[in-house]
Amino acid sequence: MAAKIKKNDQVIVLIGKDKGKIGIVRKVIAKSKVIVEGVNIVKKHTKPSPSQNKKGGIVEQESSINISNIAILNPTTKKSDRIGFRVKNGKKVRFFKSNNTICN
């Protein structure tokens, strides 16, 4: 099955502590998890590494979120939407189901 959500898609969070936040997908992990820019920020404790000249401390970074907890944002309606597939000129393209516009 083709990926309905891809890198650089604008998405909205549906469930969780960041519900309602909008961000851009930075990475898709194994078709079940994604990393969204500015969403699900966690604090990671790192040890100092003198060989790599890295200081230790607490670093904030984005953690993965399940793909079922996000939805793609339709730029024309500014609301969450579902994605469908169709063949156009011999190529498989994604489209928004609410208004049948082609997704980039």
UniProtKB/Swiss-Prot annotation:
GO terms for cellular component: ribonucleoprotein complex; ribosome. GO terms for molecular function: rRNA binding; structural constituent of ribosome. Transmembrane segments: none annotated. The keyword RNA-binding applies. Keywords: Ribonucleoprotein, Ribosomal protein, RNA-binding, rRNA-binding. It comes from the Bacteria. PROSITE patterns: RIBOSOMAL_L24. One of its GO terms (biological process) is translation. NCBIfam families: rplX_bact (TIGR01079). Belongs to the universal ribosomal protein uL24 family. PANTHER family: MITOCHONDRIAL RIBOSOMAL PROTEIN L24. Part of the 50S ribosomal subunit. One of two assembly initiator proteins, it binds directly to the 5'-end of the 23S rRNA, where it nucleates assembly of the 50S subunit. One of the proteins that surrounds the polypeptide exit tunnel on the outside of the subunit. This is Large ribosomal subunit protein uL24. It comes from Buchnera aphidicola subsp. Baizongia pistaciae (strain Bp).
